[in-house]
Amino acid sequence: MPKKKPAKHSGEDDITIPVSPQTGSSIDTWWWLTHKGTTTSFLCISLFALLIRSAVTMYPYSGAGIPPKFGDFEAQRHWMEITTNLPVIDWYRNGTYNDLTYWGLDYPPLTAYQSYIHGIFLRFFNPESVALLSSRGHESYLGKLLMRWTVLSSDAFIFFPAALFFVLVYHRNRTRGGKSEVAWHIAMILLNPCLILIDHGHFQYNCISLGLTVGAIAAVLCESEVLTCVLFSLALSHKQMSAYFAPAFFSHLLGKCLRRKSPILSVIKLGIAVIVTFVIFWWPYVHSLDDFLMVLSRLAPFERGIYEDYVANFWCTTSILIKWKNLFTTQSLKSISLAATILASLPSMVQQILSPSNEGFLYGLLNSSMAFYLFSFQVHEKSILMPFLSATLLALKLPDHFSHLTYYALFSMFPLLCRDKLLIPYLTLSFLFTVIYHSPGNHHAIQKTDVSFFSFKNFPGYVFLLRTHFFISVVLHVLYLTIKPPQKYPFLFEALIMILCFSYFIMFAFYTNYTQWTLSSHFGSSDKEKKQI
């Protein structure tokens, strides 16, 4: 039987969790569930989060009523049309009924399978919405309603359970914590304003790949490494942008394997889990090298250039002074961006290979995804969802920095959301996040105890710089909405917004990389050296 530690009466919300002699035992998780009331908190917050998502769906989506190609909504609908009417081998192949220049599939097979399942659902209730060829640009009320419901259901059945899995494991490893702290953390994850606006406003299914990633992260924390490999392989098979997290998973798992009696066997076991998962879900395309390469070519549209539109990363921001596209060929830019991304990811990877820990792994996820966002090839505004998800999971460790990152992550997508006519949801969710973030609880005290190594606040002028940044951002909000830019510089305000957001992101990246290297090794049982077979 697990031994319960004596309760400490430091506050009515503080609870001491019994420690199971076996890591990952269901005993301590069940005790935690029944004594902390997490189920009630999670259900209440989940219902509220679904209500907010439903409210956002009432607003326009990407490309609404704008022919000939409309936007991401039409892309997702078109993929349902293709997958429900054509053989699986033709889903990625250009042909009479599948014109790849009109929203051809450019995500891995799991996205195609998801489109097929959702397409069957749409065809049952509204066959016209997925009829081959004739359904292009379909925007009936029922069709839009069904499409919105597919995103809501994906969120509810994939992202929400994954979030609960993570919260259970994460707070079980934290030997003390209050109900309000746990509820606040759940709210920060489920009421992620960036994800809500992109999936339920703009219209995408990021909740699926991010949900699988969160599940894989939770599996790491409870030391289920094979499950980690399976879930993360599924995330990669749904959206290739999940590769933003790959350096963190690779370095952490490799670091743990190297500390065991049989490191090679450990690596082989995990490698088999990855290979089997990929083979199963890529099965229709692994029989022929040509078919396999055909799918891969759709996943890497290098011809679009190193960046698209205005994104707050290094390449777009510096292009104001350095015309990258004019100075270098696409092939050269691919090599340069790859080298820059590897160099930016390397410090956090080395730290986890040398000293793998649960907390270091969470920081590694944040640092590798931010490195990809800042320096990789063909980054979109929506790609900020990757590092922002990692920061959300670390919200209790970085409460102040997390609030600032949320603001600038939202602001970096402001022009995109305005084009989609999502200004009201943008302002409403920003306000809602601020209210919930400042809700009663003890989360602000966490920073003093858990992240005490280094802070920008120790630098003279930091507070002034932060306030100046914020003031400029408010001015840019107003200018963007009220003043027409000069004809000579039609995207002036977008460029200024990107410069401002990039300047914050790069400071944040330096801070989190430094913090990862100065972590103590008290978080979780996996931080201790173990010799396993």
Swiss-Prot record:
Domain of life: Eukaryota
Disulphide bridges, residue numbers: none
E.C. number(s) listed in UniProt: 2.4.1.267
InterPro entries: Glyco_trans_ALG6/ALG8 (IPR004856)
Cellular component annotations (GO), alphabetically ordered: endoplasmic reticulum membrane
Location(s), subcellular: Endoplasmic reticulum membrane
Name used for this protein in its record: Probable dolichyl pyrophosphate Man9GlcNAc2 alpha-1,3-glucosyltransferase
Organism, scientific name: Arabidopsis thaliana (Mouse-ear cress)
